[in-house]
Amino acid sequence: MKILKNLGSLAFVLLIAGSLQAGGHASSLKWYSDGGVDLITFEDKEVIHLSKEQLGSYFGKGKQPYKGKKIAITVNNSGPKGGISGPLHRLRPAWEELTGAKLEIVEMPLAEQLSKTMFDLRLGSNQYDGFIEGAWYMGEYVTPGYIIPVDKYIADPGFPQWDPDWFPPSLREIHQWNGEFYAVLNDSDGQVLYWRQDILGSKEWQTRYKQDTGKEMPQPPKTWRDVIDIAKYFDGKNWDDNDAEEDDGVVMHFRVNEQGMFHFMSLSAAFTVMGGDTVDRGTNNYWFDPATMEPLINQPGHGRALETLYELSQYGPAAQSAWDLGTAWDWFLRGKSIFVFSWGDVGSLVQDESRSKIKGKLGASVLPGSYEVYDMNNNRWVKLDKPNVAGNTTGGSWQGVISAKSKNPEVVYSLYALMATQPVSMWNVNRGWTGVDPGVKIHFLPPVGSASVLGYIKEGFHESDLMYYLDAYHKNFFADKMLPYLRINGTEEYWRALDQNLSETMIGRMQPKEALDRTYKEWNEITERRGKAKQLKQYQEAVGYKN
């Protein structure tokens, strides 16, 4: 049995509760004389220790403040040990014993979750008390008043304790709406570049690369052109000794409705996002012209980005156009590609030797940049002395929100808050299968955070992998420029159109320009159908545009 303690030393105290509940059922809690408690996870029997202060004053041995109540929470259909849904299953018995309430976990396919929950809310069936949502759903939920702010619960010391000040500004923003918190800390999504450090850092391979290409191998890659050149060089070579087959330069995934379009968003920021102290068409902006709501998706910067993505994809497995996320990850974990750029799950999954062959061989960095960025204000390419690098919060940052129709909002919040406490959050980020990624202060190392190298190593991390991993994510979430996050009404529709057209490009049915021109047309149609004036007002508020 693995015991997780709060980072830092923790004195052992007298165990005062037995391992059985009344009635002889195995308990999921073990209480201590100081008011602390061990949460025992379902099936795995791992132990997460919370102090009395972390637990909150409403909860304690024998209290069960919500006895007899029941809540239903929707989440992605990943199963009892899958991403995002798995932690709910693993912590449900402990939470139920702690609160006295019952939790129904309602799993839904990613492509159906927003439509099903919105249908329920509009119809007034009120089947669900809360949603573990992708951050891009928030506009759909907030603007009609379907979810409630949680600031008053956060400030209440009775609930399990977590601190919004842990957030970097980039992540704080996507948990709030108009300055109020609607979502609770859970997952921190952003994409970084991963590579095989044992290969790219090898003097033998560096020498061979220079002999064969006449150039030094960039280490780490600074631009997307560097990534393409290196991927091209290694593609088709058997550079990894895990098998006798040829290996690839990169791996991605592009199956429709499997989040493949996020590859394009993250990569394209280097060619499109220009920083500054304002927001306008070409500054700190990406999606639409904030003065007119004209889509910018087919601008030259976006076009070059898609051409770059397509070129890079040629140095990966031919089948990746039909792959889902997990299949692409496993290709990298098996040692079959030099590069993958993806979410934080990869860094922790690399440590799982039942799934990974590359523990101790990982490199990672903030996503590469471009020496040219397209200025959408002046309609020209700008050449730079240093690569244009932008951070991102690409992905779902899957977060708990509470239905305004719930009769038990405080019960829902108690579940979310428990998941957000430092011990539970650290338990999550140390296990790649949970889908919960690092991104806040408690996950980073001093002097920028409060976690410890030893704590991660005890949980199975290789120290070299860890240092690359956390440095990449800190630089990503605290980057000077960030890819703006789209959360307005219709985001799901806008992104679905982009996803489908990108897939057509990746399988060779459509040229990049045609794909983005079609997306431009479809985005205009979505905007008109939803009401251009309303969409424009919401977009202006979302990006901070001042007319």
Model-flagged regions — what are they?
Residues 29-65, 135-192, 243, 363-367, ...:
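Hinge/lid segment of periplasmic solute-binding proteins
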Residues 31-50, 58, 62-65, 348-357, ...:
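C-terminal lobe and pocket-closing loops
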Residues 56-62, 80-100, 194, 198, ...:
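Short, polar/charged alpha-helical segment
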Residues 67-80, 101-106, 129-130:
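Short, well-ordered beta-strand elements
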Residues 90-169, 174-183, 202-204, 208, ...:
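Extracytoplasmic "Venus flytrap"/periplasmic binding protein-like
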Residues 107-116, 222-226, 320-334:
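Short helix-initiation/N-cap motifs at beta->coil->alpha
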Residues 176-187, 191, 225-290:
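Extracytoplasmic/periplasmic solute-binding protein
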Residues 226-231, 273-322, 363-372:
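Glycine-centered hinge/linker elements that transmit conformational signals in sensory
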